[in-house]
Amino acid sequence: LAAGLTVAVAVPAGVILTVLPGPGYPAQVFDATFHLNAVAAIREGGNASMLGGLSALYSGRAVYYPTVWHGVVALAPGSPAPVSTAGVLALTAVVWPLSLLGLLARATGLDATRASETDRVHRRQRTCAVAAVLALSAAVVGFPLLPMTALAVWPYALSVAGLPGVLVLYDQLRQETASWRLRLTLVLLTLAAAGGVVAAHGTGLFNLAVLSPPFLVNLLVSRWRRCAARRGGRALLVAAAVASVLVLVVGAWGMR
């Protein structure tokens, strides 16, 4: 597993470091120029709000723009170009491989704490499979190398990098648990993670709308069965489902 993760980290990092003449050389694309100016504007103005933090780039007008990436990068010491390069390296070679590892571990059951002798054999096989997928992920150009280099759509890439974590939390939510405290913690973490994905870039709302329905349907069906014998249980679930749909519709309309 460590070998697969090492390949997933080393290959994209090596590609970026060998292509750039130096960390202070900005990517020669339009979006990179805008994002570098956004980092400088946040540092000078001291405002990283998504609702007006980049007003200096819009002739003083307060407009919506996802500034999570720029706000985080602006906290690092150094001029905008090298700290942005460091951010590109961190997301491409650290955040995404670890995010992918978490999703694969959850999907294959490697995060399970207890295992029988038979399960241990299967666990070793799954570990090898996950390590192979991690190593092969370094050869995928579509993400994160393309958005982080040739396109320089860094806020969007940050939003996509957070999606595996949300899916892991979705899967944990649909599992039965006896502790209401644990379930409440998972709900709060899921809301925070989903909110972070949307805050990083508005298209995160659309991505969540595409990825969430299978998990939500499974969760609602299981809750429907459990609440069937309770008075008012089904009505409460229907109300929650309607409210969720309304929130998605209103959010999609606002982000259009």
Identify the function of each model-found stretch:
Residues L1-L20, A235-S244:
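Start-transfer (signal-anchor) and selected internal transmembrane alpha helices
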Residues A10-P12, A135-F143, A194-V198, V245-W253:
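Aromatic-anchored segments of alpha-helical transmembrane domains
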Residues A13-A161:
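Active-site lumenal/periplasmic loops and adjacent helix-entry segments of GT-C-fold
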Residues D31-A38, I42, A240-R256:
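Transmembrane-lumen/periplasm boundary regions of multi-pass, lipid-linked membrane glycan transferases
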Residues W96-A107, G162-R174, A192-A193, A209-L220:
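Transmembrane alpha-helical segments
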Residues T113-S116, L163-T185:
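Membrane-interface transmembrane helices that cradle and orient dolichyl/undecaprenyl
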Residues R181-G202:
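Membrane-interface alpha helices of multi-pass inner-membrane proteins
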Residues N207-S244:
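Perimembrane helix-loop-helix junctions
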